[in-house]
Regions:
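Gram-negative bacterial Sec-dependent N-terminal signal peptides
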Residues: 1-23
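A residue-level marker of the well-folded mature domains of exported/periplasmic proteins
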Residues: 21-321
């Protein structure tokens, strides 16, 4: 099924880029995300789409159907570059695997990275959340939630990561662990779990953690899919009062969990800005204009207490269409 979906994406790409009127009057800058079905990546694509409208750029919206489909994304990148666009914007699925493909692509067109790094020094510019800082923010949010419940930031905590070898997730884990170790001596990391990118796996991991660690007080689920699964497990086991969960990113399900107390806090990026500024930067690079090597697009801790504030509300409810 995955092969079929990638093939369909590549056929769509070829038809889109090679149409007779397509490249005649506007530059083409494809954006390649990790998973076109994910709400997070749909927000990124919405930002890129708006940039295309504002700047007069054709923006093919591409990506595999799962973040674990690394080879699918590599094929899409190679075929995109073969169509000779003005530049390419990509969110690499996996750090090591995308290194060489990005190197090769950058020999032909400017490559702008967003969200997650690859093992390459060939990016013209890289726009992302400072994910180490994002992990620190999550640790602070979790410590505060535990303190509010138990009076002190003390007890057992756990970390759930979606996939191994993903730059952004590794950095979030790094920041989280460093902040816990340096700032919260009363918190003990008793489990560091890595899943397979599926929400059902996160649900099972969280359920097992609840069973194996009866004194568990907090969990950081470091991306949207892991937070979905972990939140579902906490809800099903009625543990929201005793186990505080901090997630990363947001969608309708996680916002619902935030409202009802299943999730204590969400670290929310600005994916719309990431997509918009990715296209804007790529266009500038294609014109040989100077662009920054790195742009931090920011992260914010959102709780039930502040979710209706203007800034936080805009991040939780972006205009996708």
């Amino acid at each position: 099924m995955k092969k079929y979906l990638v093939a369909a994406a590549l056929m769509s790409l070829s038809a889109t880029l090679s149409g007779p009127s397509y490249a005649a009057d506007k530059p083409t800058i494809p954006i390649i995300v990790k998973d076109t079905t994910s709400f997070y990546w749909q927000i990124v694509l919405a930002g890129a789409r708006k940039a295309g409208e504002d700047l007069g750029v054709k923006v093919p919206e591409l990506g595999a159907q799962s973040e674990s489909n690394i080879n699918g994304q590599i094929s899409i990148l190679e075929n995109s570059v073969a169509e000779k666009p003005a530049a390419v914007v990509i969110a690499p699925t996996e750090f090591k695997a995308l290194g060489k493909p990005v190197d090769e692509a950058a020999k032909k067109v400017p490559v702008i990275g967003i969200d997650s790094a690859a093992d390459s020094k060939a990016f013209t510019s890289f726009l992302t959340t400072d994910n180490v800082q994002g992990g620190r923010i999550a640790a602070d949010g979790l410590a505060e939630a535990i303190k509010e419940k138990y009076g002190k930031a003390e007890g057992e905590v756990a970390l759930i990561t979606s996939l191994p070898g993903v730059g952004s997730l590794d950095q979030r884990a790094k920041g989280f662990k460093e902040e816990i170790a340096s700032k919260y001596p009363g918190l003990k990391l008793v489990a560091d779990k890595v899943a397979d990118g599926q929400a059902t796996t996160a649900l099972n991991i969280m359920t097992d953690l609840i069973t194996a660690n009866p004194d568990l007080r907090g969990v950081f689920a470091s991306n949207l899919i892991m937070a979905q699964g972990a939140g579902q497990a906490i809800a099903e086991n009625k543990k929201a009062d005793t186990i505080k969960l901090v997630g990363f990113d947001s969608d309708d399900k996680l916002i619902g969990f935030l409202k009802d107390g299943t999730i204590a806090a969400l670290v929310v990026q600005d994916p719309y800005r990431m997509g918009y500024d990715g296209i804007k930067t790529a266009l500038a690079a294609s014109k040989h204009e100077k662009v920054p090597a790195f742009v931090d697009t920011g992260a914010n801790l959102i709780t039930k207490a502040n979710m209706d504030q203007p800034k936080e509300h805009a991040l939780l409810f972006p205009k996708v269409k």
